[in-house]
């Protein structure tokens, strides 16, 4: 297959291999030589850093004032609990944030399944362990989940918080990306007689909140939108061409019939070879009154119709009629 030098092969989605519920391999081919690494690296960076998702941003635990402490009856310290909460895979529908609550008592593990939430919130990993209780102890907490993009450290959020932030409200480093791991591999591909093509294999692990195929589609859309600016690229030093203004107002080039005058007035104008509005506005009141069968009533009608369009009788138009109309007259 030998095409034009300006034509490039377009890849197509060939296969999606679901390795496990959160991991999949997506294969795209054929790609022109070198495009496997070009597109693979670009998609990888977007998938890791620019995909929107949901993450825990704040936590309040009853009886806890700061993260460098522990809670009686809980096996993990507070820092470990916050780290475990960062592993929650949450989907929020129809809004940008949600408040979750958790209350548990009695010895044993505390998991994401123990969290109470609204119907527009879905927790994709209910078996995720948050902490372990010992003895006949309990734990209660409120968890704020927000939609966002990229990675936002707690220190950055603290700078924007008011100084009156309640003691005990713990800020969490938030990784909003639903993609936990992404790697790509470029293999050889063949189309007919061409053997120098690329096959792109993307190995993706997510937190279960997004389908791998949808993740590829979203990342490709983001990349395409950013590249649109280069498609429309223009030399900034190139002087912009000024649009030439029309010699006459377009309304002057329209036939007098567009004024929707009475039959009597319209016939009088046609008898005087007044075919266009530009012809009409150059006439004076005295000239029109000399027109047979055109009286003051018709004159008043014509003046009112012209005034409604910002025109009047007695206007002077240089170079009238234009060449486009002169041939028709």
From Swiss-Prot:
Alphabetical keyword list: DNA-directed RNA polymerase, Nucleotidyltransferase, Transcription, Transferase
Matches recorded under SUPFAM superfamilies: C-terminal domain of RNA polymerase alpha subunit, Insert subdomain of RNA polymerase alpha subunit, RBP11-like subunits of RNA polymerase
Gene Ontology CC terms, in alphabetical order: cytoplasm; DNA-directed RNA polymerase complex
Protein name stated in the entry: DNA-directed RNA polymerase subunit alpha
Domain notes: The N-terminal domain is essential for RNAP assembly and basal transcription, whereas the C-terminal domain is involved in interaction with transcriptional regulators and with upstream promoter elements.
Superkingdom of the source species: Bacteria
Keyword Transferase (UniProt): yes
Pfam families the record matches: RNA_pol_A_bac (PF01000), RNA_pol_A_CTD (PF03118), RNA_pol_L (PF01193)
